[in-house]
Amino acid sequence: MRVLYITANPKLIHHSVSLSLGELALQYYRELNPSHITDRLDLTTEEYPHLNSDTLSNFMNPHSNLATQSKIFKDYDKYIIVAPMWNLTVPSALKAYLDTVIIPNVLFRYTEQGTCEGLCGGKMIYIGARGGDYSHPPQSEYAFDDKYMEGIAKMIGLESYQSYVANAVGGYRRRSVAQWVEHAKYDIEQMVTSF
C-alpha cells in the first residue's frame, strides 16, 4: 500500500493547526500500518505551474510531463491532503497541483453522455483548518475547501472520502495549536482507523 501525504501550508508546524493535525493523522496511520510506504509532497517547496497556454497545450499529450505527474499520482492507493482554507477555498499551490495532475484519460474520462468517470481507486482524507467558523449556515455555504476536495475525490473515482476541518482556529475559539490537536485526537484517530 502506498500513501501520498500532501501539504500546502508555508507555516511552521508548531504555528499551524492543519499541519499539526495532518502530522497526527500520519503518525496514527503509520502506527496502524507500519509496512505501508508513505511519501511526502510539500507544495510550498515544489513548483507546479498554474494552467496557462503552455501547460494546456500539453494537457492531452500522453508523453508530457503533466501525464507523467498524473500517472505518478495515480500509482498511490491513498491520499492524505492537508491545507488551510484561504479565501474560502484551498491554497493556490494545491489548486495548481491538482490542475496539473488531474488529466483526462489518466485520472478520469468523459463518458458518451458527457459525465466524468473516475479511473482511480483508493481513498482520500482531507484535513483542513479555517480561521473563522464556517460550520453552520450562512457561513457554511461559502466554505468551498472541503466541498472542492470531495468533488475532486468523486471526479477521479476514489472509493472513499473523509475529512476533518477545524473551524474558528483564528477566531473566538482561542486555543493553542497543542489544544487544537488534543481536541481533535479522537476524531482523527477514528477517521484514520477506517482509512
UniProtKB/Swiss-Prot annotation:
Keyword Calcium applies: no
Entry EC no(s): 1.6.5.-, 1.7.1.17
Gene Ontology MF annotations: electron transfer activity; FMN binding; oxidoreductase activity, acting on NAD(P)H as acceptor; oxidoreductase activity, acting on NAD(P)H, quinone or similar compound as acceptor
Record flagged with keyword Transferase: no
Gene3D superfamilies associated with the record: 3.40.50.360
UniProt-annotated binding residues for FMN: 16-18, 85-88
A matching Pfam family: Flavodoxin_2
Family: Belongs to the azoreductase type 1 family.
Role this protein plays: Quinone reductase that provides resistance to thiol-specific stress caused by electrophilic quinones. Also exhibits azoreductase activity. Catalyzes the reductive cleavage of the azo bond in aromatic azo compounds to the corresponding amines.
Subunit structure: Homodimer.
Name of the protein this chain belongs to: FMN-dependent NADH:quinone oxidoreductase 2
Organism: Photobacterium profundum (strain SS9)
